[in-house]
């Protein structure tokens, strides 16, 4: 246990970090159920939590409000703890359309989803780490409170094999099929197995690159090895191995048979109710759909929408909470909730929206009433299952303030950076004044964030600034996660200087190059101009030595006053600390790739953009000729499975087509 968790870092805790670390550790050792780390932007809250985890030596679940922040945290903890099991648990849907019925138009919408195979593998790897290891750190989103396969059924489906044990090949293959692995005779992919004589190759569903080879001799396991499925190279000989199921929802055969009997009984009961109410169409629909599901479960062991029978599959009573990731956590686990002022209300809001949709499906005969128990946790159930918890936020919400037994304050940054200076200027001349400020900041080589109240205003301001020769982009709600990361990356690299947004410039945007944050119409009281929103938005300039914030307002609202008072309180504390310890504030020099997961996407596009100048003077004929040549190269690389080269040429090809359209 001595070095269960070990941090790798060139830095030691500084500023308020040592005090905060000691306070949180003391609280955990004293048995406090809930604590809050009130840390300003850029104060190194992640580093503080890493030291708490290292000291406590306990498995940890970290929850973030969205996939973007979860990816950022995953990257940071992976760097701090390279020797430990840092895992990622978010929704594996790239696209998800839940099953729904609209009575007004008599429209039934079938469930439609696109599953990201890589994220599914990471989810399986996360639960495997919690089961097998004491040094697991799981970074998750609100997906952690949604129904997951029952851990007892999951553990009963494990396949344990040891060298020298008696094991019939047919039994192994039957077990793999029950675990939902599929047989193949071609190249081995994740979740598949292949048989050549007495050799069984298995590509575990939780593995990213390595497969397992089982060699049998006369019904005895003769050899077990880990190998590379691409090259066939043996990487390591193993004395024993445990193969985990392909999905969390795998269920033993006897449980399936029990479930079918319970579903049949509920179906008869529900049909009697519907017929008594003269709902004949609903009764016929329910009988047809449920009987089809029963047939599929008996034949295949699963069916489409099997999660709707999760109450029976996990052997629960009506209304009982579903099994979730929390059921896989060991009793001594820690729970860290990042940006808690957003994440806590998010957790509280998941249950009701899900319930309303499912009640309609039940009332109109699309699902049995037991489907209502396939749901996320209610907030009180989440509280019951939560181990010792630390909430992290620069602006803790009312729940954290009310329930925390200890608040560790982290106001002083290790870099000595002070909170931005805040000015208030009149609304009447806000656009012209902003233009003047933007030009000054650009001349210094820094960037600017501007936040507006409406989409229309953001669009108009972007157009106006662009017309006046300023390189500007608009970040709106239609931009997906990856594109949003690319836009932020381009801002940091200086591809453009001003980023305009509405409510997208708050939590977790790590941009040291931003020297000015401008908040237009700051005196319009509401969600976007609340005390928390203002403090968070002002904080976006806190990573720059010259960071400033300008609030355009004609009147001083209560939210503004409280936000300014809190910012000033922090500034005074930071300045006093710097003076006492002789610290000169230093800017944060973080490379773009350090901050953004998936930055390579933007990097490739930047490289392509750099080639643009050599094509600008080409004639349309020359461009067309080059486009045709690139198209042939692209398809040739794709046919040879050289997808990275094909993608690189594709970007250049699209750039040239765009150039040709302009001529």
Curated annotation (Swiss-Prot):
Cellular component GO terms held in the UniProt record: cytoplasm; excinuclease repair complex
Keyword Hydrolase: yes
Record-annotated Helicase C-terminal domain positions: 430-596
Span(s) of short sequence motif Beta-hairpin: 92-115
Keyword field: ATP-binding, Cytoplasm, DNA damage, DNA excision, DNA repair, Excision nuclease, Helicase, Hydrolase, Nucleotide-binding, SOS response
Chief location bin: cytoplasm
One GO-annotated biological process of the protein: nucleotide-excision repair
Gene Ontology terms, MF aspect: ATP binding; ATP hydrolysis activity; DNA binding; excinuclease ABC activity; helicase activity
Record localization: Cytoplasm
Binding-site residues, ATP: 39-46
Stretches assigned to the Helicase ATP-binding domain: 26-183
UVR domain ranges (all copies): 624-659
Role according to the record: The UvrABC repair system catalyzes the recognition and processing of DNA lesions. A damage recognition complex composed of 2 UvrA and 2 UvrB subunits scans DNA for abnormalities. Upon binding of the UvrA(2)B(2) complex to a putative damaged site, the DNA wraps around one UvrB monomer. DNA wrap is dependent on ATP binding by UvrB and probably causes local melting of the DNA helix, facilitating insertion of UvrB beta-hairpin between the DNA strands. Then UvrB probes one DNA strand for the presence of a lesion.
Record comment regarding domains: The beta-hairpin motif is involved in DNA binding.
Subunit text: Forms a heterotetramer with UvrA during the search for lesions. Interacts with UvrC in an incision complex.
Family: Belongs to the UvrB family.
Protein name per its UniProtKB record: UvrABC system protein B
Species, as recorded: Legionella pneumophila (strain Corby)
Encoding gene, per UniProt annotation: uvrB
């Amino acid at each position: 246990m001595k070095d269960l968790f070990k941090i790798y870092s060139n830095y030691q805790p500084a500023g308020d970090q040592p005090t905060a670390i000691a306070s949180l550790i003391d609280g955990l050792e004293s048995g406090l159920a809930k604590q809050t780390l009130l840390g300003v932007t850029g104060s190194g809250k992640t580093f503080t939590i890493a030291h708490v985890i290292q000291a406590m030596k306990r498995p940890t679940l970290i929850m973030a409000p969205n996939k973007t922040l979860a990816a950022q945290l995953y990257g940071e903890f992976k760097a701090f703890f390279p020797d430990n099991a840092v895992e990622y648990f978010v929704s594996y849907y790239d696209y998800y359309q839940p099953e729904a019925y609209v009575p007004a138009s008599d429209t039934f919408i079938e469930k439609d989803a696109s599953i990201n195979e890589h994220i599914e593998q990471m989810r399986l790897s996360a639960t495997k780490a919690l089961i097998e290891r004491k040094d697991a750190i799981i970074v998750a989103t609100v997906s952690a409170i949604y129904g997951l396969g029952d851990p007892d059924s999951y553990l009963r489906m494990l396949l344990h094999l040891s060298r020298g044990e008696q094991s019939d090949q047919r039994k192994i293959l039957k077990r793999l099929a029950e675990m939902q692995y599929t047989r193949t005779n071609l190249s081995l992919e994740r979740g598949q197995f292949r048989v050549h004589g007495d050799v069984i190759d298995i590509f575990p569903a939780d593995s990213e690159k390595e497969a397992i080879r089982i060699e049998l001799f006369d019904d005895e396991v003769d050899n077990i090895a880990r190998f590379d499925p691409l090259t066939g190279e043996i990487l390591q000989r193993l004395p024993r191995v445990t193969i985990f199921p392909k999905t969390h929802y795998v269920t033993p055969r006897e449980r399936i048979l029990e479930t079918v009997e319970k579903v049949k009984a509920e179906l008869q009961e529900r049909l009697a109710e519907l017929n008594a109410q003269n709902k004949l169409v609903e009764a016929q629909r329910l009988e047809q759909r449920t009987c089809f599901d029963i047939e599929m479960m008996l034949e295949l062991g699963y069916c489409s929408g099997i999660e709707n029978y999760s109450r029976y599959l996990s052997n629960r009573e009506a209304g009982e909470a579903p099994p979730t990731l929390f059921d896989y956590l060991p009793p001594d686990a820690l729970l860290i909730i990042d940006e808690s002022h957003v994440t806590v209300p998010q957790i509280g809001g998941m249950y009701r929206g899900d319930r309303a949709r499912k009640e309609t499906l039940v009332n109109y005969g699309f699902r049995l009433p037991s489907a209502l128990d396939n749901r996320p946790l209610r907030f009180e159930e989440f509280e019951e299952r939560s181990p010792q918890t630390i909430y992290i936020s620069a602006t803790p919400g009312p729940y954290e303030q009310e329930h925390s037994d200890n608040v560790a304050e982290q106001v002083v940054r290790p870099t000595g950076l002070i909170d931005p200076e805040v000015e208030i200027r009149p609304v009447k001349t806000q656009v012209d004044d902003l233009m003047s400020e933007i030009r000054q900041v650009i001349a210094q080589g820094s960037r600017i964030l501007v936040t507006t109240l409406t989409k229309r205003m953001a669009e108009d301001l972007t157009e106006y600034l662009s017309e006046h020769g300023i390189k500007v982009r608009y970040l709106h709600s239609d931009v997906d996660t990856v594109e949003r990361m690319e836009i932020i990356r381009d801002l940091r690299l200086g591809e453009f200087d001003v980023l305009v947004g509405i409510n997208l410039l708050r939590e977790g945007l790590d941009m040291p190059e931003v020297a000015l944050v401008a908040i237009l119409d700051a005196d319009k009281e509401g969600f976007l101009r609340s005390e928390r929103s203002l403090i968070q938005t002002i904080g976006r300039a806190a990573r720059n030595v010259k960071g400033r914030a300008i609030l355009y307002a004609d009147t001083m609202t209560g939210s503004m006053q409280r936000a300014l008072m809190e910012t000033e309180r922090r500034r005074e504390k930071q300045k006093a600390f710097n003076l006492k310890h002789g610290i000169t504030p230093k800017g944060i020099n973080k490379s773009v790739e350090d901050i953004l997961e998936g930055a390579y996407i933007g990097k490739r596009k930047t490289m392509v953009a750099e080639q643009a100048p050599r094509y600008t003077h080409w004639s349309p004929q020359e461009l067309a000729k080059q486009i045709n040549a690139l198209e042939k190269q692209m398809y040739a690389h794709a046919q040879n499975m050289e997808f990275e080269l094909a993608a690189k040429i594709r970007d250049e090809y699209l750039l040239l087509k765009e150039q040709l359209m302009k001529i």
